[in-house]
Amino acid sequence: MNTRPLVLPELLPLLEEVPTVDLSPDALPGFRRGLEYAAGQSFLQAEDYPVILERLTIPATDTAPDLRLLTVRPRKDATSPRPVLLHLHGGGYFAGQPELTATQLCQFAQDLDCVVISPDYRLTPKHPFPAAIEDAYTTLCWITRNADTLGIDASRIGLTGESAGGGLAAGLALLTRDREGPPLLFQNLVYPVLDDRTTTGQPDASPVGGEFIWTRASNTFMWTALLNPITPGSADVSPYAAPARATDLSDLPPTYLSVGALDLFLDEDLAYAQRLIHQGVSVELEIVPGACHIFDQTDTPVATRSIARRIDAMKRGFGL
């Protein structure tokens, strides 16, 4: 179905700036180079914000290498320990880095008066599941152990992520609940990747999702690399990799979920939000008409409004 007429006019330039590509092993190097360039540009722009950006390292263990972190904190002095926002970047699990959305992280740190910490987690296809989520959990535990040094309040940890990072955040919320790890005040999920079964073809799937930016072919490539050697859609996929597989969603933190109406992930995100509600989790859901994947990575009114709502939800989550 031709969905271009459904795209908000202000987002049409995005379709020219980010050409839609069906990802494959051959296309992956070029995709990574594009995100590396975008990350560099975003990091340069971040220097205009009244924040301090710092790169830290969690030392290697017997089972994992050094883990690099990007931290962002307001430049102004704190009068008390700040809340902390754990951010997980997007990029299909096989590309990206914390600097990819550095300007947004600066805005979060500034508007929420919090410390933002984003790990440079291991990527597929070299490091399939569970490498990324274990890196995310390692970061969460490191935050609580180093709260005094970081000047943060370990009882006020929020979680956010976009796209693959949103799926990783949802998986981390499940994992830390089941491991009785550090408590989370909220999960703020932006067009999260949640369900590997979308690769198998579903007759009731939205006919308007996935034409632009992130396609069904790219989605299949992503899930295949993440779950290797397990086949996407098979019975033994972990809910920590595909949170939609979880049967028990109770006792998860209050959730804010945002997705565009033209995003490939619309159906799985709506289904997840509904199941959270049915199991007693507080949920706010934003569906953005005329918006495709990564719409919020643009300098447009619709992106500004969506990010403002996201920040407002996190303020309430932190009790601000």
Question: Where are the model-predicted features located?
Answer:
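Gly/Ala-rich beta-loop-alpha elbow adjacent to hydrolase catalytic centers
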Residues: G161, G165, A169
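Alpha/beta hydrolase fold serine-hydrolase catalytic domain that processes acyl esters and thioesters
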Residues: A154-R156, A170-L320
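Gly/Ser-rich "nucleophile elbow"/oxyanion-hole loop immediately N-terminal to the catalytic nucleophile
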Residues: T144-L159, R179
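A glycine/proline-hinged amphipathic helix-loop "lid/cap" segment
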Residues: M1-P74, P232-G233, P301, R305, ...
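Short beta-strand-to-loop junctions in surface cap/lid or active-site-entrance loops
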Residues: T61, L69-P81, A244-L249
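Alpha/beta-hydrolase active-site loop
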Residues: H127-T149, R310
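Short beta-strand element of the alpha/beta-hydrolase
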Residues: P81-G91
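Short amphipathic alpha-helix adjacent to the substrate-entry channel of hydrolases
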Residues: E99-P119
